[in-house]
Curated annotation (Swiss-Prot):
PANTHER family: E3 UBIQUITIN-PROTEIN LIGASE MARCH 2/3 FAMILY MEMBER (PTHR46065), RING-CH-TYPE DOMAIN-CONTAINING PROTEIN (PTHR46065:SF5)
Signal peptide: none
Subcellular location per the Swiss-Prot or TrEMBL entry: Cell membrane; Endosome membrane
Record-listed Zn(2+) 1 binding positions: 13, 16, 48, 51
EC numbers on record: 2.3.2.27
Gene Ontology terms: cellular component: endosome membrane; plasma membrane
Functional summary from the UniProt entry: E3 ubiquitin-protein ligase which positively regulates the fast polyspermy block during fertilization, preventing entry of more than one sperm into the oocyte. After fertilization, required in the zygote for the selective degradation of a subset of maternal membrane proteins including cav-1, chs-1 and rme-2, probably by mediating their K63-linked polyubiquitination.
The protein, known as: E3 ubiquitin-protein ligase marc-3
Sorted UniProt keywords: Cell membrane, Endosome, Fertilization, Membrane, Metal-binding, Transferase, Transmembrane, Transmembrane helix, Ubl conjugation pathway, Zinc, Zinc-finger
Transmembrane segments: 98-118, 157-177
Binding site for Zn(2+) 2: 38, 40, 64, 67
BP-aspect Gene Ontology terms: protein polyubiquitination; protein ubiquitination; single fertilization
Species whose genome carries this gene: Caenorhabditis elegans
Length: 431
């Protein structure tokens, strides 16, 4: 039955009509993930966070114009550098240009300084004259009273002029600063930065391409990484997420190569996130402590992903891991074409695989297993709804041909190269 809720095209942002890896993100990342913060379904509900925030800032709205959903918004005020850089003083004709006022202040500053300096010097000169007349008052019958009165008046006049010039200059500067500060506050109130809070959690948000590697990092991250290397703890690995797109390939933008990275978190034996019929999934992946040690994982590649339809999909949080474990589960399938020295290998070792969590608004989880070029290949059943391709640069190595399916097809390194398997988690793990 046709699913009318499924999108027929690739996942793109509703505003810029571009995919996840089509635009640079914060100047460092390969692309920006798509989020679904409103109730619109399909690609109509997908946004780049930066595009949505820019649109809400320009339109001064907080609701979706289609579903009328009220976005959860957090606002942040812009600084004065943004005000100057974006030309906020040009929004109204009544606003004065701060650069012109600043140039005018710089122009009159030397004149004001010279006027105050000369006034103070005149007051000091009059004070010295008064002091000389006062010291020689006995030589004059009037006690140099006329000279003393004149110098006192001159000193007071010079001090008044100096104070007047200084007050006028300070008043001019303060008034200019207050005017531009008021202009800036009005612009700041009308041009706040809006941060959209995604209504869905990390699992329910739709991420359509593999997670990219985090670039750089601050000094805290570097110290934590160095301390982790000293204690020999595994570094954090980002979870690759593969989207459901109803058998429509997601073509990445030319020139951008997403990186498939494995997640190495351990699942507990009593967790509902594991297959209870397969205890080997809970084993610790000895010898595989970091993503860099995994074969054919964390290599730049160009993925073409075909996801599974919504059939028997179950909800489970991110943290599921198809661990890089060495299982010794006895295989009951027949083996053929095996050399005599390897004929005793009935306990097949599981291949290294990545557990990928995917959901469309919390509707499903899929397991993704990537074959490794070694002597123990895991067979991939050719099914149009459960088989995906992943072009990788695995080195060519000789491998023993093993037949693990009933179709009689021979599984070789060439036939299994660059493929990964998408499995649906059944509901029987709760039983």
């Amino acid at each position: 039955m046709e699913d009318f809720n499924a999108s027929l095209g690739p996942a793109v942002c509703r505003i810029c009509m571009c995919g996840e890896t089509s635009i640079p993100y914060l100047g460092q990342q390969a692309g920006e993930p798509l989020i679904s913060p409103c109730k619109c379904s399909g690609t109509m509900g997908l946004f780049h966070r930066s595009c949505l925030e820019h649109w809400l800032t320009l339109t001064s709205t907080t609701n979706c114009e289609i579903c009328k959903f009220a976005f959860k918004i957090k606002q942040k005020s812009r600084n004065f550098i943004d005000y100057i850089r974006q030309g906020g003083y040009k929004k109204l004709q009544s606003n004065r240009n701060p650069f012109i006022d600043f140039a005018f202040v710089l122009l009159i500053l030397p004149f004001a300084f010279f006027g105050v300096f000369m006034s103070v010097e005149g007051a000091l000169y009059a004070g010295r004259k008064y002091h000389y007349a006062f010291e020689n008052r006995d030589n004059d019958e009037n006690g140099n009273l006329e000279v003393r009165n004149q110098t006192s008046l001159e000193c007071a006049l010079f001090l008044f002029v100096a104070l007047l010039l200084f007050s006028a200059f300070i008043t001019l500067v303060v008034s200019a600063l207050w005017h531009h500060f008021r202009q800036y506050k009005i612009w700041q109130a009308k041009n706040k930065i809006m941060f959209v809070v995604d209504q869905l959690d990390a699992e329910q948000s739709m991420h359509f391409n593999p997670q990219w590697k985090k670039q750089g990092g601050g000094w805290k991250e570097k110290i934590a990484k160095f301390w982790g290397e000293i204690r020999r703890r595994p570094t954090r690995a980002y979870i690759p997420e593969i989207a459901r797109n109803d058998s429509i390939p997601i073509e990445p933008v030319v020139g951008i190569s997403p990186v498939l990275v494995a997640n190495f978190n351990r699942t507990s034996p009593d967790s509902n996130n594991t297959h209870h019929h397969d205890e080997s999934r809970n084993e610790i992946p000895f010898g595989r402590r970091t993503p860099e040690q995994a074969i054919c994982v964390s290599m730049s590649s160009t993925p073409q992903m075909y996801a599974e339809k919504l059939e028997k999909l179950t909800l489970s949080p991110i943290g599921l891991d198809d661990l890089f474990a060495n299982s010794r589960a006895t295989s009951t399938r027949r083996e053929s074409g095996i050399s005599p020295e390897s004929s005793s290998r009935r306990d097949m070792r599981k291949t290294h695989s990545v557990y990928s969590v995917c959901s469309s608004f919390g509707t499903g989880v899929m397991s993704c297993s990537t074959p490794v070029a070694d002597n123990n290949l895991r067979t991939l059943t050719p099914s149009p709804i459960s088989l995906s391709t992943f072009k990788s640069g695995c080195p060519t190595e000789p491998v023993v041909a093993i037949n693990l399916n009933d179709s009689g097809d021979t599984v070789t390194i060439d036939s299994q190269r660059g493929r990964f398997h998408v499995e649906t988690l059944e509901n029987d793990y709760n039983s």
